């Protein structure tokens, strides 16, 4: 562990973006401003602000936010004393026009996110962000679903489009430290030395901190976390804990250990609609390696067909389903109900 003594990392805050998921994208401008100012004062260098599903995420499918991306970004950016602001963009949801808008409002970092086997859809957005001279990140989601060799190919594609940092993203909170090490080591070795490596964790198996430290050991210099863990599932890596652990290990974050605790406790916990914890549902997501948005579909299917949502989620994980295949959840539930003799004869 002493090998990390004196190493510096950039802690990237997710409270105001991934944290939009448990808030159903309904954070107020005042909540955004207050939390962002607290994070800024605590020394957090980079803060992500958008709809939970990124720029342009406002839709029937993903949820309508309380305010537009422009309003959220416009409220936060002028107040920042030292922190820079980032925005997430998923090709197919966010467009080049959203990217331009973000740049004009003063967004410093753009993170272009794709499924971990689909980096090729990011070329237009990554190359355009680089043209705008933005800090440009390629963000490979659900990374447990690709092999280290497969992730290397995808990471190199994003790097070739112009990304100056590549993220390995554990969207389901499925990975264990050894999974993180084998993937990040391979990607770190394959990228140019000047290309940064990042890690985004979820706490569904309580591995957020351990995985983040494993990532730092493999050369990651950017680590995502959220105050009080506010994020999808059991939340993101809790920032106040990560900062304290890094401090104990001699890893420099530039974030004040006490101030970030106060932001989490005094500003973030009071706005939670429900406790962010490892409940049965979040644990199943992590155990089965399933994307968080499948949960409600699985619960609906349970009511309709009598197959427990937990069993269905495990099966979806086994089949390697990814975001966008929500229609297959119904099909899988129907098949399982048939196999278990839960359907009336005429339906079978």
Swiss-Prot record:
This is 4-hydroxy-2-oxovalerate aldolase. The active site is at 21 (proton acceptor). NCBIfam families: 4OH_2_O_val_ald, PRK08195.1. Substrate binds at residues 17-18, 171, 200, 291. PROSITE patterns: PYR_CT (PS50991). The record marks 17 as: Transition state stabilizer. Coiled coil: none annotated. Keywords: Aromatic hydrocarbons catabolism, Lyase, Manganese, Metal-binding. GO terms for molecular function: 2-isopropylmalate synthase activity; 4-hydroxy-2-oxovalerate aldolase activity; manganese ion binding. SUPFAM superfamilies: Aldolase, post-HMGL domain-like. Residues 9-261 form the Pyruvate carboxyltransferase domain. Mn(2+) binds at residues 18, 200, 202. It is an enzyme of class 4 (lyase). Its EC number is 4.1.3.39.
């Amino acid at each position: 562990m002493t090998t990390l003594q004196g190493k510096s990392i950039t802690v990237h805050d997710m409270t105001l973006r991934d944290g939009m998921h448990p808030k159903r994208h309904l954070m107020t401008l005042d909540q955004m401003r207050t939390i962002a100012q607290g994070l800024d004062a605590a020394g957090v260098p980079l803060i992500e602000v958008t709809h939970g599903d990124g720029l342009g995420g406002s839709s029937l499918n993903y949820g309508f936010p309380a305010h537009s991306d422009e309003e959220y970004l416009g409220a936060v950016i002028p107040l920042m004393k030292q922190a820079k602001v980032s925005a997430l963009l998923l090709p197919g949801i966010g467009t080049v026009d959203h990217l331009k808008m973000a740049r004009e409002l003063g967004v410093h970092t753009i993170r272009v996110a794709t499924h971990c086997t689909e980096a090729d859809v990011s070329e237009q957005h990554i190359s355009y962000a680089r043209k705008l001279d933005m800090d440009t990140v390629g963000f490979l989601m659900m990374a447990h679903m690709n092999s280290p060799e497969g992730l290397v190919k995808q990471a190199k594609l994003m790097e070739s489009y112009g990304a100056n940092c590549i993220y390995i993203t554990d969207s389901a909170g499925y990975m264990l430290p050894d999974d993180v090490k084998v993937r990040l080591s391979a990607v770190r070795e394959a990228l140019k030395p000047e290309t940064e490596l990042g890690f985004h964790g979820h706490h569904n198996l309580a591995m957020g901190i351990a995985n983040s430290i494993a990532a730092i050991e493999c050369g990651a210099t950017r680590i995502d976390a959220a105050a009080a863990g506010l994020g999808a599932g059991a939340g993101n890596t809790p920032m106040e804990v990560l900062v304290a652990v890094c401090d104990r290990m001699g890893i420099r974050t530039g974030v004040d250990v006490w101030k970030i605790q106060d932001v989490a406790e005094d500003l973030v916990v009071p706005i939670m609609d429900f406790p962010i914890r490892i409940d049965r549902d979040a644990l199943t997501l992590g155990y089965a390696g399933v994307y968080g948005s499948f949960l409600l579909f699985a619960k609906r299917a349970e009511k309709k067909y009598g197959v427990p949502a937990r069993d269905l989620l495990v099966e979806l994980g086994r089949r390697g389903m990814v975001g966008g295949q929500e229609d297959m959840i119904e099909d899988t539930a129907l098949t399982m109900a048939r196999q278990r003799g839960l359907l009336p004869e005429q339906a079978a």
